[in-house]
């Protein structure tokens, strides 16, 4: 789920996966967004952040959030989801030091933002989570943007997941899926309802047609097992000098596929309630908890402390654990 590792190196150069864009990116200091306001993953710096990140004379300037194409795509889709879900989402209650955070006591090489909106009582929504990370590394930077919308136990409908992992100006990893909540081999009717009837696989086929696309496989076998057979798990590599091509693909084919997948989820999953036997519901809840706990273990506890330090990482992970409804290990 929340992938906090750099993408695999591009085939053209061992270091290209972490090379910094040669194009001049727009730099966005973090901004705490108003509770209940429209989706924002970047903007003007609040006074609190300015105070915490002020560098002494001669000190290294604090890292700022870089505005890349996939963050704009994520903001647009988050706004679409919020507009559609409306009052089914409660205002954000994420504390300020988790809504915006950075490494090194304010002048480090990594910055991030996290926003979580819980589902209102009586809705099918468990939570909607948005996160954005920018980490400077020796040969460049890594930028990760995530949008998760998870459903609660009133329905067995799939969750929505979108994640972009960019470690190079010419390459990106994209993860897009309706995450299944049942063993698909044991429930062919589940495949038919949410994956065949919705024709969701057409989006994967379109992305796979890109000559720059190749399959992406997580190093974790468990993580691989959680995705559906229609998941878009692709690495897009545009090669040397392909910055403009990658941006066109992100704003074009990837944005189109992500919007189509979200629309399918909003139309076919978000409002669907399910009649289930108690044992069946308990098994689904258990499966959800295992997937959530394992994703935190694999992707967060092993990587976030290295990027932000233990104190910041502990605060952020605790907030995500709260959203996921899992206990600290």
Curated annotation (Swiss-Prot):
The lineage of its organism: Eukaryota, Viridiplantae, Streptophyta, Embryophyta, Tracheophyta. Induction: Induced by wounding and senescence in leaves. PANTHER family: RED CHLOROPHYLL CATABOLITE REDUCTASE, CHLOROPLASTIC. The keyword Chloroplast applies. This is Red chlorophyll catabolite reductase 1, chloroplastic. Expressed in leaves. Expressed at low levels in roots, stems, panicles and seeds. Pathway: Porphyrin-containing compound metabolism; chlorophyll degradation. It comes from Oryza sativa subsp. japonica (Rice). Catalyzes the key reaction of chlorophyll catabolism, porphyrin macrocycle cleavage of pheophorbide a (pheide a) to a primary fluorescent catabolite (pFCC). Works in a two-step reaction with pheophorbide a oxygenase (PaO) by reducing the C20/C1 double bond of the intermediate, RCC. Belongs to the chlorophyll catabolic enzymes (CCEs). May play a role in senescence and response to wounding. Residues 1-61 are annotated as: Disordered. It comes from the Eukaryota.
